[in-house]
């Protein structure tokens, strides 16, 4: 059985884009993250160690948005996905 964790509307200013003004002025980015996982162990134990920490996922995503600039949004999204996929249980 697979369950889903969805974080929506994570907001931060980033300096991503192909154009100079995007890197210079920055812009607001809104990130949604969907993770497929299995909640059964966490449901039985009521222990954060048995699930994915939503706050950690949000911090990872926002760190990418506010971090070094990417030209393409696709590259930013791939970096966020790569970070999330390193978490146990994903």
For each predicted feature, which ranges?
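N-terminal, polar/charged subdomain of small-to-medium soluble alpha/beta proteins
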Residues: 1-90
